[in-house]
Amino acid sequence: SSRTIVYKGMFLVHDLRRFYADLQDPDYESAIGMVHSRFSTNTNPSWMRAHPNRFILHNGEINTIKGNTDAMLAREESISSPIMQDDMNKILPIINTSGSDSAMLDNALEFMVMNGMDLPLAVMITIPEPWENNKNISQKKRDFYQYYATMLEPWDGPAAILFSDGDVMGAVLD
């Protein structure tokens, strides 16, 4: 993306600036910065599975990962996109199942964003707050979650997610 730069390395957070020369430039500025310094918890840790991903930083586990990825795979037979049109088969499969649970969630969000959905909306649909038994939630919000629950299963943790597309940054807990 022209709005984001992703740095990755096997070092402690305080070593990031020493490792990447552009971060040492006093004129280098950014409105948004996110750092993740943990490792895979429910998949085997490896360099390829290490954060960062394109849209999210994730701490926790996606306990529904098998069902989520199976559902996404099943949808691929009938999925269409006004943006991708006849080129849809070039980006399948949507989910790279050799990645970590975080990477697979990032794949799903990337697909939604690249097909025209705003990232905050994609996150709210994918990782909805607990709403069904929440008596303090507004009817408007309840209707929102109920509507989208018919289209996509929640990616449930326990998880804390930080997200950004370079323009906006947000965080959710499931």
Predicted regions and their residues:
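Conserved short alpha-helical segments that host acidic/polar catalytic motifs at enzyme active sites
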Residues: 1-174
